[in-house]
Structure formats: structure tokens, C-alpha cells
Amino acid sequence: MIDQKIFETTLNIDDPTNFCTNVEAHLLKELENIYVGKCFKNSFILNITGIIQRSPCFIMRTNNSGRGYMHVRFSALVSYLNAFDLIAAVKIIKNDSNIILGESLLTEPVTIVIPSSESQNNVAEVGQIVPVQLANSSVYYIPGRQQASATGSIFIPKHTFSVYHVQEELTQEQALNLTKLVNIIEMLLESRSKKDFKQICFFEKLYYTYSISSDEILDLKIWKGPKGKEMSRLKPCNVLSFLYDALKNKSSSLGFWARPPNLFKSSPLAYQQDQNSFNATELPIICSAEVMFVTLLKEIINYLQFMNDLCDTFNNEQLIKRHENIWMLIEQRKIGHDF
């Protein structure tokens, strides 16, 4: 994720006299030399965007070096990864019986360790590009390093899902706070609309949880899955439309919410029930409407960005065909696959 962050640090100043002739320019240059293109406080710093606050230049009195130091608050454009993030393009650089190593082609520089398993070890080849999901609490930003490190695995369609129990209505103020995430989704949907429709169908079908025969049609324009995979008693709601109605107090968020496997992962759809009849493996999570919607919206963003990145990375039929072994590994993990 790309974001703005604010940091605090203390800089050592070798030549305080020269430094103070043009503090802002020297300070910005020093910050860029030390932090840009490196890891710092759980982020990878892309650019220094501003100096928010600085102290005077203090002279060190513990020795006779004549050096100084300055406390600084600055803002920076950063990139950072979170647990369970999806990365569409990780190039395999090493694969042996002990470990698989990959480098992300899309995010900040990061080396990803893929724990070796029999299936993944036998399939992934050096030089191939694989989609990866990061593991829980697996991203490490060691200060001063020029790349982060993480652990993950080749991303396989998930069979499990969470159910959320909302017992208080979403307020207009909370709905307004969610519009930033809604805007990101709409931007990603706009970007998606400009991509090759055949590619979108290929990857949506690949990451649909159920195994789909080649003659089953996907109506991606209305996010409708193959016949027989729908929850016949329920009609999904568009989360974006729901939140726009919430701004006008025209919708109720009470009840049980979920995004079960019959929905396309990147669809802006969810199911809402008065009584919980979802066939989930875990008990419902009791939470506020705001927390639930933030969770759903971020999941939709993650998958939409993932699908867009897949289309951009595997942008021709030859490249897709060169990775048929990866697609087969993914296909074999679906519900209903004939082993």
C-alpha cells in the first residue's frame, strides 16, 4: 500500500556552522540521503514530502567534536505491506529442496520466502512469476536495509469465510468516513473496465473458489457466478450502493454479513441476513457496523488490485501459457475439482 506517514527522528550534524547557513535545504538533503530507498519504522520510504517541525541545532557537549544534532518531524511517501496482502507478481529466484525465494515485481523491493512444500516445490520454476499471499505477521522492515523481507505462499482460492454480526446501525458520520475506501474501489473498477475482458474472465475464473467447467459462462458485468453456485434463497447487495444509501439513512446494517465463496473475490457484493444461516466453520464475529464495513471494503480493494495487477503482469497469451503449471496448481485446490 502507498500512503503518507509522519516520522520523528534525530539527525547528527557533522558541520553545524555550514548546516545552519541553509537549514531547510541541508535538512531535506540529509533526510533523503539517510532514508529514501530504505526501510524505516515498518515502511519503505519512497520520497520525503515535507518537514513538519524541527528543533534548533544543538551542539554536543559530551565531547569536543563540535558536532551537533537536531530533532525532526517529517512526512514521507511510503510503501508498506501487511499480513495476508496479495502480490500478483513474485519472480522465483531460487527453488531447492529447502526453500523457495522470490522477489516482488510490483511492490517496494521485498524478498519473499515461500516455505517449501512438495506441491509448490515441484511446480514453481526459477524465472517463473507466481501470485503470492503473505503470511500472518510476516513482513520485516529492518531499518537501513534497501529491501524488506516476508514469508508467504502461492495464493490458492480460499474455502473459508467470516460472518459478522452487527447489532448497531451504521451512522451517517461513519458512512461518510468510509467514502475514502469506496472511492478507491470505484477507481479500481474504472481501471478494470479498461483492461482486456478476456484476461479478466481468465483470472476471475481461476480464482473462483469452485471448479468451473469451460462451457460455464461468467457474467462479470453483474458479478454473477456459474449456475448452481448461487445462494438461491438470498440476493447479494452491492456494498457500495448500500453505503450511499446509508448516507441518506435509507438502509439498515443490522444482522449477519458475509462474503461466502460463491461470490467472485473482487466483486463489491456481500450477503446480509436477519438470522445466521451461513455455513461458516467459525462462530460469527460480533463487531460494529463500521469495523465490519472497513473489513469488507479492504478485502474488496485487495482483490480488485490483485486482479488488475494479474492482468497487467500476464498481459499476453504466450506469458499465460508459460505459467500453465502454476494455474493447474491453483485449479487443483478448488472445491469440486476432480482429482
Curated annotation (Swiss-Prot):
Family membership noted in the UniProt record: Belongs to the asfivirus D339L family.
Name of the molecule in the record: DNA-directed RNA polymerase RPB7 homolog
GO biological process per UniProt: viral transcription
Cysteines engaged in disulfide bonds, as pairs: none
Induction data: Expressed in the early phase of the viral replicative cycle.
Localization per record: Host cytoplasm; Virion
GO CC, any one term: virion component
Source organism, top-level taxon: Viruses
Lineage: Viruses, Varidnaviria, Bamfordvirae, Nucleocytoviricota, Pokkesviricetes
Swiss-Prot/TrEMBL domain comment: Contains an extended C-terminus, with no homology to characterized proteins.
Residues in coiled coil: none
Keyword annotations: DNA-directed RNA polymerase, Early protein, Host cytoplasm, Transcription, Viral transcription, Virion
Subunit structure: Part of the viral DNA-directed RNA polymerase that consists of 8 polII-like subunits (RPB1, RPB2, RPB3, RPB5, RPB6, RPB7, RPB9, RPB10), a capping enzyme and a termination factor.
Functional description taken from the UniProt entry: Component of the DNA-directed RNA polymerase (RNAP) that catalyzes the transcription in the cytoplasm of viral DNA into RNA using the four ribonucleoside triphosphates as substrates.
The UniProt record lists the keyword Transcription: yes
